Amino acid sequence: MSVDKMNQAILNQLRLNSRKTWQQIGKDVHLTGQAVAARVAQMEEQGIISGYTIRQDQLSRHFITVFMQNSEFTRFENFLRENPRVESAYKVTGEGCYQLCFIADTPQEVERFLDSVLPFGRCKVLSAIRCVK
C-alpha cells in the first residue's frame, strides 16, 4: 500500500478540508475532478482512506492514561469502541495500559466518562490548554 506523490497531495488537500469537491482538489493538484475521484476510490479500496471526520476544538481534548485493575480487556475495548466521544484509543506499553483521546464540551462530561472507566481501573488525565500545531 504505497502512496505516490499525487495521492499524497490529494490526502493533504483532504486533511485541510474534506468537504472540497473533487474538482476543487483537482485544480489544486493539477488533475481533473474525475481523476481525483478515481484515485480517492482506489485509496478507499486499499484501506489508505478509511473514513471522513470532523475536527473539533483542540482544547476540548483530554488525554487519558488508563491503568487497568482487572483483566477485562475485551470488555473495556468494546466499551471504548461504543463511546463516540473517545476519538482514539491505543493499547500501550510503558506507563499505563491504554492511552485515550477523549473529546468533551464540559468538565461534567469528562467527570461522567471517568466515573464510567472506574470499574476497569484508575486514570491519569491531561487536558489540552493550547494547540501548538
Task: Put a short name on every predicted segment.
Residues M1-K133:
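A compositional/biophysical signature of low hydrophobicity enriched in polar/charged and small residues
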